[in-house]
């Protein structure tokens, strides 16, 4: 969670010059990428990454084992909001074509990240709620789609200089969130009983 949060904060900070340019020259931005979208690309990954950094750090300190409420739902709402934004943003570029399969896979990984983020927030904000099966299913799906599809595709496109820094950091963040899903699915299984 901490590494995914750091990558998402980097993605948001890298969008800073674009948001600044959008404020200075709004006439340069068309209806395809409005000014408010530049600000959403700046603020949402920073807030989502900050939440993942903060609660990932708290989980390392042992707060995850205690049965207490871990945070405010208002700040936690930025996590699924960011992944919903990524899902919508990626879905608009996916035409019905086999040649655009990488774009379609990115849509699926954003949907898996959104589902896992919602389940993760449910675990953090409502302690003691029996949701092991849901956490296992969402964590496994996030691992398969985010780490199994998004991360190799991001690394391939980065190796061929096809990505900008914000897209690279967002892809790495979503891929690392899938590793967090694997860890959560592993922990949701519990200890082996004989």
Where are these regions (language model features)?
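Transmembrane alpha-helical segments of multi-pass membrane proteins
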Residues: 1-10, 69-85, 134-145
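Short helix-loop boundary/capping segments
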Residues: 75-81, 85-90, 100-120
